[in-house]
Structures are given as structure tokens and as C-alpha cells.
Amino acid sequence: MATPQAPELVPAQYLLSPDAAGPRTLIDILYDTAACYPEAAAIDDGTVQLTYSELISDIEASVAWLAARGIGRGDRIGIRMPSGSFALYEAILATLAVGAAYVPVDADDPDERAELVFGEANVVAIVSEAGMARGPGSSRGWRASAPLPRDDAWIIFTSGSTGTPKGVAVTHRSAAAFVDAEAQMFLQDNMIGPGDRVLAGLSVAFDASCEEMWLAWRHGACLVPAPRSLVRSGMDLGPWLVSRDVTVVSTVPTLAALWPAEALEAVRLLIFGGEACPPELATRLAVEGREVWNTYGPTEATVVACAARLDGVGPVRIGLPLPGWDLAVVDTD
């Protein structure tokens, strides 16, 4: 058993913090991608499809609008919008681009939870389907500007061990390091890129939604949001994946187990997380031409801390740390 006082006892393959990518922000990532693939599709909700250049244009207009209303770097904005719409993701990106952190609450959650979360997070504004309203918090008074790596990107509230919501803030540096780390792991022989379509099926109040978004936007792929009602139906989502030409999916094993094999024929990257993956599911879905990964990580560790590629034959493991992460087993001392 290793302890912080005895790092030499931790095998080298579990200590990958020296492999972390250089510090940058999520907005840096988005602009780099847009510069490489300006005419590639960035988001397609079935009604509206935007290229990366169009998405950037929309975001910059929103930043000017937010700045004119006194919102700037270091502020926090509550996001409570229905899933499945490009407008939800534009609101998140505009929040990041103005230098603020987004605080998501599922649109279907009770009003009491929204009030608790937004009050605890001290949000200065709340964006909903109806528009933007004033929040319970006060602005820091800083001007709108591009975020710095040390600035918070999001604050996501978990249930906490006591059942009381607990906010976990993640900086741009940590978030971008996570995005860049996954780029070093998945589909190295034929990387994600324009032409790939990434499912956005998770609630943005769940930190794994960040993986969905940035699997697309780090690589010039297209984010394809699914309405919450469709995701909750379970089985109906399978045929929808086919109709929307989805090629990359990050989901929970319980949901994937409901889909027929043909629903995933075009999916070349399938990522599991959020719960244990049954070995029989890995055996069924880890087929030639598709990478299947099992991931694990607490919210505090920035979405995912470790991952293992599944071959459908060996045991299901949580794997080794992402590049830039360390893993250790410690005792109470």
C-alpha cells in the first residue's frame, strides 16, 4: 500500500502527471479547432446545424451581449435549459468565452434544487429557455475577457455523501488537460475528426457531458444533441443513433445494453462510465472496427481519472491513469 509519504512505492505506470499537456483553456481549444476546420459542422440538433465558423460568430455576439450587461471574467452563470437544442450548448460556450463559469441544473430538476444550487454558487445570472434573468449573486466587477487557465470553467453540483448538493469547481487548466489527455488515448490509428458525429445524450448537470462536448470540439467533429425524453426512453435512442449517423458515443452501460447491435454499427468509439460495466456487455460490443473503453473518475478529479480499453475477452478493469494524472492507494495516515 502506497502513501503520500512514500511515492517510490507507487509503480511508474500509475504516476503520469509529468505527461500533462501544457496549460490552456477550453476556449483556446475551441478556437484552435475552428481555425483548423472552419467549415466543418460543429453542432447539429436536427433543426439547426452550425459550422465552427458560424458557432464562433454566434458565441462572439453573445459575449458582447453579456458584457454589455455587466457580466465578466470570474462571474458565474446558471444554465437551466432543455436538452437537445443547440441553444443550450451555445449558452455554455458563451459563458466560458466571456470569462465566466457555468453552473448547470437539469431543466427537469425541481425548482427547489435549482434555487439551492444557484444560491450556493452565487450566480449573477440564470439562462433559461425564456431568456436571461438576474441571479442571486453579485458580479466580481471584472471586465469580460478570455478566461485564464486558472479560472473556473464549470461548477457542477453532486449529491454529496449526505444527500446535500455539493459544488465542485473545475478550472480551465484541469478541463483542458482532461480533453487533451483523452485525445492521446482514443482512436490513435484513425483519430476523431470532421465527419465524426458525437452523441450528446447526458444531462449537462452531469460532468460526463463535458466529455461528450469536447470529444467533438477538440477534433473538429460534430456534436449531435439528443432530447432528454428520447434518452430516457432507452430503447428508442438506438434507432435514433442510426438515423443521425452517430459515430462516437459516451454513455452508461445500462443504456447501451438496451440497444440492438445494429444501432451501433457505425459507432467506432464507445466509452462507458458512471457505473460498472458488465463483462458480457463488453464481450457483445467490443467488436472489430470499434474501440470500447471503460472509464472511472470522481467529479473532483475532472470527469475521468483512469481508463482501460476493453477487448471483450479479458476482465473489465478501470485501467491506468490518463496522461497527466496520478493514481495511488493511500491509508488513513
What are these regions (language model features)?
Residues 87-89, 100-114, 141-333:
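Motif- and composition-driven signal specific to adenylation
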Residues 1-176, 191, 220:
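Carrier-protein-dependent adenylate-forming modules in NRPS/ANL systems
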